[in-house]
């Protein structure tokens, strides 16, 4: 099947964005990541107007939904390029754009360093030997599965790169540490930062609940983190 691939391109934050279109003739079972790799393998790469263009900048590390690096807007919805297959998308035109909530680096690459900085500011590490209860093994495991891809932050109306609100990714990752930490002073520090950087800033729109590309039980983890950090349960 022949697909039209529309890509929003931009050389840097200071330059203007523009659209380029390419043709992909291949299997409907191909992933968007496979499409991008195939386009960049062309020498030279030409757009649909016949112009020779530079290779498309995008990120990937695993191609199997394990790293989160290939998160982007696919037909206006945040997804992972490696796990989004053409047959799951409507029509034969595929639109690719960078995530909009993070500073642009180039083309489909964004700088998600503020996501990781927010986790540091929440003090999400252990100061004591981890307490591991069999009763909370499953939610702790789910918390640890987070790819930190940023898809949940992309759809959050309360998150932006220049705000202190850390977003769902912080609450999801916080549960594991809140549940395992035994050192009370550090636990209180985490709880205080959690209230300031997540709980007090969440508008309860719940737009993050169904967007996770690996299907994390986001609502359950938010409830558990809130209970541990805010009410000490």
Where are these regions (language model features)?
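Eukaryote-biased recognition of intrinsically disordered, low-complexity regulatory segments
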Residues: 1-22
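Residues in well-ordered beta-strands of folded domains
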Residues: 6-8, 25, 83, 97-99
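Short, flexible N-terminal segments of the mature chain
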Residues: 18-34
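Ferredoxin-type iron-sulfur electron-transfer modules in oxidoreductases and energy-metabolism complexes
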Residues: 30-51, 92-233
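A basic, amphipathic helix-loop patch mediating RNA/tRNA/ribosome contacts
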Residues: 40-75
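Glycine-rich phosphate/adenylate-binding loop and adjacent beta-alpha elements
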Residues: 72-96
């Amino acid at each position: 099947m022949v697909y039209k691939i529309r890509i929003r391109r931009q050389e840097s934050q200071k330059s203007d964005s523009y659209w380029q279109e390419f043709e992909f003739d291949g299997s409907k079972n191909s992933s968007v990541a496979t499409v991008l790799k195939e386009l960049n393998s062309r020498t030279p790469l030409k757009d649909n107007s016949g112009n020779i263009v530079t290779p498309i900048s995008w990120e990937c590390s695993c191609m199997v939904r394990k790293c989160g690096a290939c998160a982007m807007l696919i037909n206006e919805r945040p997804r992972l390029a490696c796990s989004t297959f053409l047959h799951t998308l409507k029509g034969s035109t595929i639109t690719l754009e960078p995530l909009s909530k993070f500073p642009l680096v180039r083309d489909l690459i964004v700088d998600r360093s503020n996501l990781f900085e927010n986790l540091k500011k929440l003090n999400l590490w252990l100061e004591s030997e981890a307490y591991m209860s069999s009763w909370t093994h499953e939610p702790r495991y789910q918390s640890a599965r987070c790819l930190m891809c940023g898809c949940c932050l992309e759809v959050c109306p309360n998150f932006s790169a220049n705000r202190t609100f850390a977003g769902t990714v912080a609450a999801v990752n916080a549960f594991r540490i809140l549940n395992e930490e035994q050192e009370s002073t550090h636990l209180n520090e985490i709880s205080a930062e959690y209230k300031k950087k997540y709980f007090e800033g969440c508008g309860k729109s719940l737009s993050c609940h169904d967007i996770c590309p690996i299907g994390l039980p986001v609502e359950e983890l938010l409830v558990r983190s809130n209970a541990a950090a805010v009410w000490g349960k």
